[in-house]
Design a protein with these regions (language model features):
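Structured, active/binding-site neighborhoods that engage oxygen-rich ligands
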Residues: 1-333
């Protein structure tokens, strides 16, 4: 991983936006679970971010490191948090600060079942060696949002790390592409706020076809630009979720849905109004992984204001510590 300290200037409020994204992942997941917390969705993303942090620590000390391997070892430590033991035959990495922070925590609310299924293996999955080549669910999205918090690297690096993080549990190339796009969407939001919404539409346009429109809308799709398509599919995504047509929960469909809902929610200038509009769009029983990602995207634009109404949580000390460690190493703050 190549890093530059001067090529990529950080926004003045970068620290607040990073903290907002961390808070939002926990808040969005808890909101979707009717306030059950902590849960697998946000804790796995935090562990994977700590794995990336460990790789950065090694690099800071002049030692070559493999980001994907460090994230896998972190994921194994998360597996132990959930199941009280490591997968049979898998490496047993030494604990880090986050393991101590979560020691004694209650049973976690469930998330994407594919994560535990894939990690229950002695071998590390990768893009070139997928263990579940058909796995394509929304569980890759929140970790991709956290990867976007890495500053001062080029977009190709952001997308690659997010893809590698997704490949640890999900083998489908479509899921890998969605993870890379998700990270770039959040990165754009962190860097340019609402000025990046047209870029979001372009990044996720590939996945719009996963929720097909009715015949009339399909007939005009070829002539629509990315922004118009995003708005059109927003209505289709909501209208299509009927009893005889379940919503598509592939990573790409979840990403497209989240980006569209956040884009529309930002029409409200007040952060709380935008937040409420987002969850109204997500529905009464939203997919937890999609809701968590959507809330992180909102916070990437609005910073901590996006979740300023959030009540105190038992996960807050971990979020505080992660924010402090991350900013100290990546931004010198």
């Amino acid at each position: 991983m190549s890093e530059s300290t001067d090529q990529y200037a950080l926004p003045a409020d970068f620290s607040d936006r990073v903290f907002g994204v961390l808070l939002a992942a926990a808040d969005g997941a808890a909101h979707a679970r009717d306030a059950q917390e902590p849960g697998e969705t946000e804790t796995l993303a935090l562990y994977l971010l700590d794995g990336l942090l460990e790789a950065l620590e090694w690099a800071h000390d002049g030692v070559a490191s493999d980001e994907a391997a460090c994230m896998w070892l972190a994921a194994l430590r998360w597996y132990k948090l959930v199941n009280k033991s490591f997968p049979e035959g898998a490496p047993e990495p030494q604990p880090r600060w986050i393991d101590e922070a979560f020691a004694g925590s209650p049973a976690l609310a469930t998330g994407d079942s594919q994560n535990l299924l894939a990690l229950d293996n002695r071998d590390m999955a990768s893009v070139g060696r997928p263990l579940f080549p058909q796995a394509d669910t929304t569980g890759v999205l929140t970790r991709a949002a956290f990867v976007a918090l890495l500053p001062r690297v080029d977009e190709a690096t952001t997308a690659k790390i997010a893809t590698d993080a997704a490949a640890l549990t999900h083998g489908s190339p479509a899921a890998h592409r969605a993870a890379g796009a998700a990270a770039l969407v959040v990165r754009a939001a962190l860097e340019s706020g609402t000025g990046s919404v047209d870029r979001w539409a372009a990044l996720v346009q590939e996945f719009a076809l996963e929720e097909p429109a009715d015949d009339e809308a399909q007939g005009t799709e070829a002539d629509a630009n990315a922004s118009d398509s995003a708005e059109r599919h927003s209505d289709e995504a909501t209208a299509g979720e009927t009893p005889d047509r379940e919503p598509v929960n592939t990573a790409g469909a979840g990403l497209f849905r989240a980006v569209t809902y956040v884009r529309n929610a930002l029409a409200h200038t007040a952060p709380k109004a935008a937040y409420d509009a987002l969850f109204e769009a997500l529905g009464e029983e939203p997919d937890v992984e999609t809701a968590a990602f959507a809330t992180t995207l909102l916070a990437a634009v609005l910073g901590t204001d996006a979740v300023a109404h959030r009540p105190a949580s038992e996960i807050d000390p971990v979020l505080d510590a992660m924010h402090e460690r991350w900013m100290a190493l990546t931004a010198g703050q």
